[in-house]
Amino acid sequence: MKPNRLLPLVLLLTALSAHAKDFIIYDRMDYVGKPDLTADKLSKVFLVYESELVKPDPTGKRKHGVLNEARIRELAKQSRREGYRTISTDIESWFAEKDGQLLTPDELRTDFARMYQIFREENPRAFISNYGMPSEHLHGIRHYRPNVDNEAILAKWRQVSKRRAPTAAISDYANPVFYITSPDLVQWEKDVKTAVDDIHQRFPNKKIIGYIWPQYYSATSSPYFKQFIDPVRWRKMLEISKKYTDGVIIWSDKRDENNQIVRWNDPRIQATMKATQAFIHANAKEIKVEGLQKY
């Protein structure tokens, strides 16, 4: 019997296929004049900020406020009406102390469970999580502790993240923050890997969709504050994100490092998009697009 010279190639292709995974890129950039980017293989995510989800406690007892259930139900109906599946809520203040009050992990879990329930009641397709689940922004914590050794930084990160675990457990996916604070991609990748490894250990069945930003993190003490990331480095960030996660939400506000409004035709964001499109083209078979499914 003659040896099958194609067999090694077939086995190699099979192995490569087995390691390939879908990767999804959600667009939540807020640059003025941005068009619909679905044709460029960017998907849509329904992002809702805290100001629409939380209202002052009528009794005045709870300093962090309470769920605005009527508004949440309206938003949930809107998400279904407009065809969204993936939803990211952005409640951040509940995880910090406010006027001497600190919500317990059980209180957090109960309120998030209620909010998630409302979304799922009104939008059965809802795939929902909250910004920063299940852990704090490790790379940001490192930025604010430049002279602290790595083990102490990791210990602080684990400590401040611990209260999020019960809420993360009931979230549909992990939604960590991977904003970069400086051009140091080596350290950024290490921090991404550390956060992802932690998620895999604690929540092995959850998809990981991280937040990234075409600008450097808005740390006021940073010399790179909100400057645009160069396109070569941005492309590498996408490649690293694909290596470790299931997808990213590309987020931005409207302003640059000089507090100037950024328009879509700005050469800086166009360079970012060119790098993003090149990344998508190079990984076309693995880029998943989640379109709107209107009722």
Name every feature range the model reports, one short phrase each.
Residues 78-105, 172-180, 247-254:
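Active-site groove signature of glycoside hydrolases
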Residues 116, 120-158, 206-217:
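Aromatic-lined carbohydrate-recognition surfaces of secreted/lumenal glycan-active proteins
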Residues 11-19:
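Hydrophobic h-region of N-terminal signal peptides that target proteins for export
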Residues 179-219:
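Glycoside hydrolase catalytic-domain groove-lining segments
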Residues 20-62:
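Boundary/entry segment of secreted carbohydrate-active catalytic domains
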Residues 212-215, 219-294:
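Substrate-binding cleft of secreted/luminal carbohydrate-active enzymes
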